[in-house]
Amino acid sequence: MSDASEKLAQSVLSRSVGIVEPKTARFSEPLALDCGRSLPSYELVYETYGQLNDEGSNAVLICHALSGDHHAAGFHAETDRKPGWWDSAIGPGKPIDTDRFFVVCLNNLGGCKGSTGPLSVDPASGKPYGPDFPIVTVKDWVHAQYRLMQYLGLSGWAAVIGGSLGGMQVLQWSITYPDAVAHAVVIAAAPRLSAQNIAFNEVARQAIITDPEFYGGRYADHNALPRRGLMLARMLGHITYLSDDAMRAKFGRELRAGQVQYGFDVEFQVESYLRYQGTSFVDRFDANTYLLMTKALDYFDPAQASNDDLVAALAEVKAHFLVVSFTSDWRFSPERSREIVRALLASGKQVSYAEIESNHGHDAFLMTIPYYHRVLAGYMANIDFASTPRGVSSPVYSTGGAV
């Protein structure tokens, strides 16, 4: 990390939103899903930061990536070792300034951090859904997020923001609910996955599914966990999130013991790092959820319904766009972001594009990179609430209460 980045990281930690408390919205109206099934009822766990203005025109939705959740900023307790996953960007005086915006982040359906997913009880059976939880898509998530928006009494968002899989949700929001999105910020994303990215996801899924402790997804019934499979899936994913330059700078060919051991145990520092990332992930994530999230990635293709024409798919979009990519991101390369930009321009939309110099790879969207934060802060500061959706009302959907 450069001196500038280190100073920025220290500065943002001192400007936290503080202690935050997750909330749960309960919905009793069925949600029809793309797969043909429906959820008869469901819960969404979310957090909010900042204050909603009187006009209801300053709300911002944050969409999380594959392993993310609702806890985007602040701390749940004073003893927490780390803040939320995007605390560097959300808070007083930060790029997504909570002195100005009312920020909402939720755990998506199929998640494992409180929203309805494989770990939740299926009302039909009285047992956890497990592998019987329906396949969910990015469009399904956006429909559920729209209901949460209405539950909160909002008529729309000043901005919808997300990185990676979160950026795909932003793109889907702008297409599915064009009147509800004033600004769309798509970071390190793509209009659909390449064959290579689908292949990475399939290898990860096979690592989980072929683990003897997976039991067809019913590992809870056997008091088991597919630890090795989920660990391998995370190790593979983590390699794709980093760049060769970042791995060379951080690990090189360093040996843990200082000399070659001529064996198959961990010898190189990069091996140790990947195993740590894999084993720690197993303790905080669910294997069935991981399978669902990767499938949502694979299925995302908003142009498909428009004869594979992304320009046509974007025809009704009304949002202004900021699209951001990172030079060393090979999972979703800058060219994939430029595809989105070209399609937006061809459909006559307003779009700003920034390609950020970084050696952090795909994970750069989570980093405190000074120029990246200036771009994001500058864009957000120029949002005019006079042109954003406004209106605060009571909930449209029957929610069955919330805590």
UniProtKB/Swiss-Prot annotation:
Keywords recorded for this protein, A-Z: Acyltransferase, Amino-acid biosynthesis, Cytoplasm, Methionine biosynthesis, Transferase
Descriptive protein name: Homoserine O-succinyltransferase
Record-listed substrate binding positions: 234, 363
Start and end residues of each AB hydrolase-1 domain: 58-366
Enzyme class: transferase
Cellular localization per UniProt: Cytoplasm
One cellular-component annotation, GO: cytoplasm
InterPro entries according to UniProt: AB_hydrolase_1, AB_hydrolase_fold, HAT_MetX-like
Description of how the protein assembles with itself and partners: Homodimer.
Coiled-coil positions: none
EC numbers: 2.3.1.46
Family: Belongs to the AB hydrolase superfamily. MetX family.
Pathway named in the protein's UniProt entry: Amino-acid biosynthesis; L-methionine biosynthesis via de novo pathway; O-succinyl-L-homoserine from L-homoserine: step 1/1
HAMAP family: MetX_acyltransf
Marked site positions, Important for acyl-CoA specificity: 331
GO-annotated molecular function: homoserine O-acetyltransferase activity; homoserine O-succinyltransferase activity
A GO biological process held by the record: homoserine metabolic process
